Every structure is written in structure tokens, then in C-alpha cells.
Amino acid sequence: MLLVTGATGFIGSHLSKNIKSARYVVLNKNECSFADTYHVDSINGSTPWSGAFHGIDAIVHLAGVAHRNNPSSYGYKEVNTEGTIQLANEAVKAGVKRFVFVSSIGVNGTSTQAKPFSLDSEPSPHNDYARSKYDAEIGLKKIAKETGLEVVIVRPTLVYGPDAPGNFGMLTKLIKRLPVLPFGLATNRRDFISVQNLTALLVTCATHPNAAGHTFLASDSETVSIKEFTNAIAKGLGKKVFQLPVPLTLMRLAGKLTGKSAMIEQLYGNLEVDSSNIKEVLGWTPPFTMEQSMAFLKHTDK
């Protein structure tokens, strides 16, 4: 049986649909409808986990503080690093065999230039959030070496899907309201992963015997521009959009004037990953194409 943290979050709520038997860690302040739950007040370096592991073979650790929550640098460290290490150490004591840690592609950096990020790329966490995830990875590898805990690390690219937060949620709302977008001249190259594909991968990482000890850079394996990506969102929503040919220089100027420079760079920058080792190690390929994944937007659109 699996123990899933972050069960009420965006990815966790979708993961629960792919699992037959699991126990879900839920913060006491959150309501949920899961049959088997373990409640905690918070996740940090002193969280008590003594009653969480009965019958548990593997953990999928999704819970954490994201950059959109805007905590202090210590807030990231307290939850994302110290909380992860505490959970892993307590899991080892209870005899749990495997720990799947959902990290971030931000561990590798903000963008790619000549070639995609790969397992050979030097980590370059660019902010406190990414650093906290990277430090957690280092701590987990140390625990694995010392105890034999089977650690699997997954670094997803931007995760999209129904009710996704962040830039994807913003783009979806924009497309619903306005049939005109400014990405007509965009030729950048970015990798993404749908929440359907990511959750399927996480289940595989928790159960496949070959996954232990590996790090995976997770994507749909479909590299697209922001123009192509927003066209795919529109198609998934059953909408039609017109892409205005706005030069990047003008978009960057608009970003500076509105305080949205970082968002503009995220939308127009390149971020490619080499996900080939997932197929090589696990024999796994994404079950959904981007078009198929985007179709779920219309099914859940209200």
C-alpha cells in the first residue's frame, strides 16, 4: 500500500484517482473524503509519523511549499527539506521500502540553451524553492546510501491539467475570456507534462523494481512553443484563438512596465529535458499525448 502526502493538492488529488489502495496524509485544516487518512498539523523536521506507516510499502511525497505561496527562505527549508528528511528517516525506522520524491525541474535551472537538461546536467537551483528541493534530494540520497531505502526522484517540468495553478491556470482563464493572444511570433521550445501522465509515472515509480535509485526528468516528450501550447489549450477547451504577431521585445517591455518580467521570460524561454532514461529504465512512455491530455480540460470545464 502507498502513503501519499500532499493528497489534497493539485497533483495529489489526481493521483488518488490512479491508486486502488493508499493512505493519504492530510493537514488537519484541510477537509477530504479519503477513506484512509493520517492527519498532521504541519510537515517539518519534527512532524510525528509513528502511526502513519502500518501496512505501507512505499511513499509518494508530494507535500511541500511552492513558490506561489511566497514564504521566507526558511519556510522552504523547513517544509521542503527538513520535512522531507524527517519523513524519510521515520519511514526507514518503520520498514518502508521505497520513497518517491517529487522534486522540481527548477533544480536544473530556469532555462536551456544549446541542449536539453539531462541527468548529466550540473544542478543549478535558481531560487530558494528549487534549492530546498535540491537539498532534500541530497539528504534522501544520503539516507538511501546509509540505510538501503529505495529512493526515486522525479523532477517534473511544468505540470498542466484541470485546475492547475500558476501560469497554466492564468493562461486557461485568459483563453476562456479572450480569443486573442500575443504569441503569434513565438518560436521557443519548452517541455511540459500533463497531470495525467505525471500521476501515471509516479505510480510506476512506486512499484517498478527497476526504479530504485534513479532520478527522472519528467515530460510529455512533446516539445512545443508557447504559441503551440496555448493553441493546444484552446483546442482542449473547445475555443478558437487568434495569435497576434507581437515581437518579443515589445512583450518584454510590457513585462517591465507591469512588473511581470519573470512571467514573460518563463513563457517565452526555452526549457527542454531529456526524458529518455524513463523509457530505458522503466519501459514507460506517456500514456496520453498533449492533445489527449488537453481534452480533459473540456470534460471538467464548468
Kindly label every feature range from the protein language model.
Residues 2-20:
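N-terminal Rossmann NAD(P)H-binding glycine-rich loop of SDR-like oxidoreductase domains
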Residues 42-82, 86, 90, 105-110:
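NAD(P)H-binding glycine-rich loop region in Rossmannoid oxidoreductase-like domains
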Residues 78, 113-160, 180:
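Catalytic helix-loop patch of NAD(P)-dependent Rossmann-fold dehydrogenases
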Residues 86-128:
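Conserved Rossmann-fold NAD(P)-dependent oxidoreductase catalytic core, especially the SDR/UDP-sugar
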Residues 164-170, 183-206, 213-214:
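Substrate-positioning beta->alpha
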Residues 262-302:
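C-terminal amphipathic/interface module of NAD(P)-dependent oxidoreductases
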